[in-house]
Amino acid sequence: MLILSGGTGTPKLLRGLVRVIDPEEITVVVNTAEDLWISGNLVSPDLDTVLYTLADLIDEERWWGIRGDSFITHTRLKEIGVRERLSIGDADRAFHILRSDVIRRGGTLSDATEKIREALGIRSRVFPMSDDSVSTIITTPLGDMHFQEFWVERRGEPEVIGVRFEGIDDAKPSSGFIEALRREKTVVIGPSNPVTSICPILSLKGVRDAMADKITVAVSPLDGDRPFSGPAARFMRAVGVEPDDAGVISILGEVDHFIVSRSSSYPGRCIRTDTRMDSIEESTRLAKEILRLVG
């Protein structure tokens, strides 16, 4: 089974899937369009969240970073006048250093991800969507800004006029992603932000065509017609669709099975169920529902 994931929503589903499927049967391809270099190291927020979730290290209060991490280095940098865009924990930073060292030595992001996966003892396969650089750029009245500047530094306050993926036209799917598309019969599009998390993955050359003969399942990130979290509604409006499940499908494209919340207004063919995943039990129940659909 191939899972397409961002850094929110889908990791909660993953913690359920690994309890009902052999983890070795799961391949996760993760959005990298929100990556950025901070203090000399490459931070891959969505990849890190997926890796830490699969390693049972994720801070489930915030759904980013490592549970119980300290922030000594981040605090000391602030004290000496170094401003970091993200709050980076000390253990979290160690993996950023490993990733960056691999890349500086000529390796790819996929190579670095594999080293981290092995170090954490993760049995599932995890790949970046691409080894090429892609950046989500948000257009606002204040000008264009990287997603992390918009969401973290400016707390998502500026008006969103547009969203684009810089570098997407030249980027290729990672070799691990290509192989997974050849090998897997089922693709699950996780409940991550459809615009900034899933759309970059689907926009890579050849991905939609390669999914055409797969069994496809999409889990809506909306609770009724509202996102569970984050700025998804504003991004959806910025790309010209309504922030409802019909809008989600217009971004994702047609799928074989579309799972929505019980309160969704979606008029098309879908499976209505409880899509909240506030607990491991809820995540596991939804994972079982997906397995039932794909046989």
Go through each PLM region and give its residues:
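Short, flexible loop segments at boundaries between secondary-structure elements
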Residues: A33-E34, K214-S229, T275
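Short, conserved loop/helix-junction motifs that constitute active-site signature segments
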Residues: R19-E24, R208-K214, L252-G253
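Charged helix-capping and loop-helix junction motifs
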Residues: P200-D209
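Active-site glycine-rich loop that binds ribose-phosphate moieties when present
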Residues: I161-A180
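C-terminal functional extensions of proteins
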Residues: S229-G295
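Short internal beta-strands
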Residues: T27-N31, I215-L222, H257-R262
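Electropositive, gly/pro-rich neighborhoods at or near active sites that engage anionic ligands
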Residues: V30-F165
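Gly/lys/ser-thr-rich phosphate-binding loops in alpha/beta enzymes
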Residues: M1-T49
